Swiss-Prot record:
Pfam families: PseudoU_synth_1. It comes from the Bacteria. The keyword Zinc-finger does not apply. Keywords: Isomerase, tRNA processing. The active site is at 51 (nucleophile). Substrate binds at residue 109. Formation of pseudouridine at positions 38, 39 and 40 in the anticodon stem and loop of transfer RNAs. GO terms for biological process: tRNA pseudouridine synthesis. Belongs to the tRNA pseudouridine synthase TruA family. This is tRNA pseudouridine synthase A. It is an enzyme of class 5 (isomerase). It comes from Haemophilus influenzae (strain 86-028NP).
Length: 269
């Protein structure tokens, strides 16, 4: 049978999602816990492989198993064998044709900036601290030129292994809640470091170092070296993965934490 899981994890203590030798990964921890419950070796496939330090509240995985267990066992039982910074949010048996990665039609990320002169000890690692008072409205306006299907070479990491820099951005919204700025972006898929590279350049606009039109210019240049440095991984969250309705994949409130849709000034549900 094939099982899908919703996964939440704090990426601070991991070298990314993907299993690697000699370093901790989210995939390895989850596979070990699932293998214990199934009493057989389990290999999982995810919707999106996040980088070192990046967290997820809406990650989706699937695996195949010969073990027959109730859905509660896959959730509660697996959680009992996971470290505190990884958790199963839901479990569901799915059709054989479902694939966590290839069945997905879109991924959604949120990047959280904490704009304050002094850093926060409590929030450390869960947000990116910015000592500048950024202009969220200018950042939002600047980001609108990135909508649609375009060549994102200017926001693509040099080590990106994708065959094409073209991606289709469905929405890019920048909102402020007090001292927090949330960059919310959804696309069919993302090239390597695309969200963090976009955020890095939007920060330059928000700080007043570049005009709103700069983002359009960067996009047209197709040159990563002209854009701003990559934003830190700390504030980035994979918050949702979208699938066709026929798979009936469970939906959770879009977070993370207190940043649910109803609290944001702009949201595309």
């Amino acid at each position: 049978m094939k099982i899908a899981l919703g996964i939440e994890y704090n990426g601070q203590n991991y070298y990314g999602w993907q299993r690697q030798e000699k370093v901790r990964s989210v995939q390895e921890e989850l596979e070990k816990a699932l293998s214990h419950i199934a009493n057989e070796k389990i290999e999982i496939f995810c919707a999106g492989r996040t980088d070192s330090g990046v967290s997820g509240t809406g990650q989706v995985v699937h695996f195949e198993t010969n073990a027959v267990r109730p859905e509660k066992a896959w959730a509660f039982g697996t959680n009992a064998h996971l470290p505190d910074d990884i958790a199963v949010a839901w479990a569901k048996q799915v059709d054989d044709e479902f694939h966590a990665r290839f069945s997905a039609t879109a991924r959604r990320y949120r990047y959280i900036l904490y704009c304050n002169k002094l850093r926060s000890a409590i929030l450390a690692g869960g947000i990116t601290h910015c000592h500048l008072d950024l202009d969220a409205e200018k950042m939002h306006q600047a980001g609108q030129c990135l909508l649609g299907e375009q060549d994102f070479s200017s926001f693509r990491a040099a080590q990106c292994q994708s065959h094409t820099p073209w991606r289709n951005v469905h929405h890019l919204n920048v909102s402020r809640i007090g001292k927090y700025i949330i960059v919310d972006i959804q696309a069919n898929a993302f090239v390597h470091h695309m969200v963090r590279n976009i955020v890095g350049s939007l920060i330059e606009v928000g700080a007043g170092n570049q005009p709103i039109e700069w983002m359009q210019w960067l996009l047209e240049q197709k040159n990563r070296q002209l854009a701003a440095p990559t934003a830190k991984p700390d504030g980035l969250y994979l918050v949702d993965v979208i699938y066709p309705q026929k798979f009936d994949i469970p939906k959770r409130p879009i977070g993370p934490l207190f940043l649910e849709d109803g609290l944001l000034n702009r949201t595309l549900k």
